[in-house]
């Protein structure tokens, strides 16, 4: 979601609604914009929608805009599946949540996008979902795989690596494995301390 830090919550929604109205008007003309633009617009609308059923419908409509998945739109389609999976998860539909979360991650894998920032919340959310579904080992395995990819493409002292370590710590804590939880939390906070040495309030 696009962030507008200068808007408070009310004005943020008001501002986003204004932007969406402008874009909706523009994209009504078929020769303006692409299928991806239309999908993104529906995704924005789903983000602002307060009624779960309507938000789910908007995300499904967004996915329906894109007939063929290519290297150019794979990241967007993966995000749409992740968002739809998240909505299903929050609204008590675990089977549909799993289906879309797994599709989201398989697209990242298929198009060699597992190392990008988008993969971190998607895989972290999937791992937490698996833990809720009494499958913490699978969740841990997904996060360990992601840790290896981040280390290979970036490093093991970057913010992305720390976020994954913190999620691992959270899952171990949820499953009452305190020694492992402590190990991963320590790794995460060591990185946070280094990155935010000049901004301790961020830790």
Predicted feature residues:
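Conserved alpha-helical positions within TPR/SEL1-like repeat arrays
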Residues: 5-8, 37-50, 75-90, 117-132, ...
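Residues that mark the junctions of alpha-helical repeat units in TPR/alpha-solenoid scaffolds
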Residues: 31, 36-38, 70, 77, ...
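Fold-core signature of tandem repeat domains
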Residues: 62, 84, 97-107, 161-162, ...
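Amphipathic alpha-helices of TPR/Sel1-like and other helical repeat/solenoid scaffolds
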Residues: 9-31, 55-66, 146
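Short coil/turn linking the two alpha-helices of tandem helical-hairpin repeats
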Residues: 4-9, 31, 46-49, 53, ...
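Amphipathic alpha-helical segments of tetratricopeptide repeats
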Residues: 24-28, 63-68, 105-112, 144-152, ...
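TPR-repeat structural position
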Residues: 13-17, 52, 94, 136, ...
């Amino acid at each position: 979601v696009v962030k507008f830090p200068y808007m408070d919550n009310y004005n943020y929604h008001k501002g986003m609604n204004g932007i969406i109205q402008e874009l909706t008007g523009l994209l009504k003309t078929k020769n303006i914009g692409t299928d991806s633009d239309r999908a993104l617009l529906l995704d924005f609308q789903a983000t602002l929608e307060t009624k779960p059923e309507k938000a789910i419908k908007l995300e499904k409509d967004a996915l329906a805009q894109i007939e063929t998945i290519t290297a150019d739109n794979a990241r967007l389609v993966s995000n749409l599946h992740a968002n739809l999976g998240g909505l299903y998860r929050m609204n008590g539909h675990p089977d549909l949540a799993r289906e879309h979360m797994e599709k989201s991650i398989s697209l990242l894998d298929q198009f060699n996008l597992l190392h990008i920032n988008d993969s971190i919340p998607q895989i972290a959310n999937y791992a937490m979902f698996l833990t809720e579904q009494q499958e913490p080992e699978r969740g841990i395995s997904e996060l360990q795989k992601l840790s290896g990819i981040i280390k290979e493409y970036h490093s093991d002292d970057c913010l992305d690596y720390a976020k994954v370590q913190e999620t691992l710590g959270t899952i171990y804590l949820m499953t009452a494995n305190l020694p492992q939880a402590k190990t991963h939390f320590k790794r995460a906070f060591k990185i946070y301390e280094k990155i935010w040495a000049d901004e301790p309030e961020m830790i």
